[in-house]
Amino acid sequence: MRCRGRPARDMIPDMSDTTERTTRVPDEGPIEQLSEEERRTRRWERRRSAARSARRVLARSGLQGTIRGRLASLDAAGEVYDLDESVDVYGNGVVEALERKVAGLLGTEAAAFFPTGTMAQQVALRCWAGRSGNPAVALHALGHPEVHERDAFSRVSGLRPVQLTGEPRQPTAQEVRDCPEPFGALMLELPLRDAGYLLPSWEELNELVEAARERDAVVHFDGARLWESTVHFGRPLDEIAGLADSVYVSFYKSLDGFGGAALAGPATLVEEAKTWRHRYGGQVFQQFPTALSALLGLERELPRLPEYVRHARVVAAALREALAEAGLPWSRVHPEVPHTNEFQVWLPYDADVVAEAAIRTAEETGTLLFGRAWDGTVPGLARTEVDVRASGLEWSAEDVRAAVADFVVRLREEAGRVHG
């Protein structure tokens, strides 16, 4: 049994949403003369270029686009909002329309727009701590605040993280009940990204919430990717969100918006959160491009997410079979049946070797199978994430197997080059 305040961070190596640097590195000079950071940056640029030019990809996201392309994506904004309305000023207008839309989807009394999820969650849990008188927040050691936010909970908001477990799975109701110190809030990341985008079962989620109630704690969902969780739970968004006292959702991950987040919950909490949003510097003068992109994502991407999740399972099964057929000594698709439209792939090679093989495959065949970074914190073991979106729906299982075969050829070439 484990429940303690800190650390235990790297149970699974860090792979932040913004891990890789985007600073441009000149192409001159042999790669051997570059620093490690310069090599990573050059590889990032090659992968981005390959993603843009590839004829076939499993997912295309705004992160890989151009400014011109992203601006063009707002051409359809008139379908979701009256563009003859005045621009927003400090959170009114289109921002309020977005807040009402989110509250309606999640079945909450109100919602508040935030420029970032980091700010939204700190504000939410700070508000709950003020009401309960307890700044302790029970959460997973792999939760986003513990791994990707530079100790913001404690350094900025006076909150105290209490880790329920560091195992690469969701915490259990018994771990919540057995935590030897009191806590004011239970924070559940749904899905838990760094463990493989894992979700509990619907029954397990209800048990977790009930265990928190037994401890007189409120329940907050880190729902950055909650939008794509309905297939796994077999429940609509409002029923899922209805289990929690407050919910954070993101607009730029699965919805592919320009940025931004929302905090949803009781009207009194949201009103207080807006006060803290201002104090935290989140009362931005005008946000209509971001708000419009979020409304477009809710209109266009949200209805398609269940289809992405179901097809991700087809892709994952084909990947697993093809890697096994290729005779790799050890490989893993995790989880075997994805809970969302994203999952992990682990391969028994150094990350640099796998990354180079993945980029070469895209450059030489026009098919990008692995479009994200490879983490190599564990020597000789590489891990990446696979995301299936609209472009991935065009892939059959046979297409996946063919792409794996092309990739494995180059993987063995790169491994042979490195190891002589």
Which residue ranges define each predicted feature?
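Conserved C-terminal alpha-helix-loop-beta "cap" of PLP-dependent enzymes
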Residues: S16, R24-R40, A326-G420
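Active-site C-terminal subdomain of aminotransferase-like
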Residues: E37-E38, D194, L199, G242-Y349, ...
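Conserved N-terminal alpha-helix of the aminotransferase class I/II PLP-enzyme fold
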Residues: E38-T116, G130, A141-V147, A152-S154, ...
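Buried hydrophobic positions in well-ordered alpha/beta secondary-structure cores of metabolic enzymes
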Residues: V102, A120, F153, L186, ...
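Active-site nucleophile and cofactor-binding loops and adjacent substrate-binding regions
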Residues: A111-T118, S250-F251, Q286
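PLP-dependent aminotransferase-like
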Residues: A129-A185
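Hydrophobic beta-strand scaffold residues
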Residues: R160-P161, V219-H220, L369
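Active-site phosphate-binding strand-loop segment of PLP-dependent enzymes
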Residues: R169-A224, E228
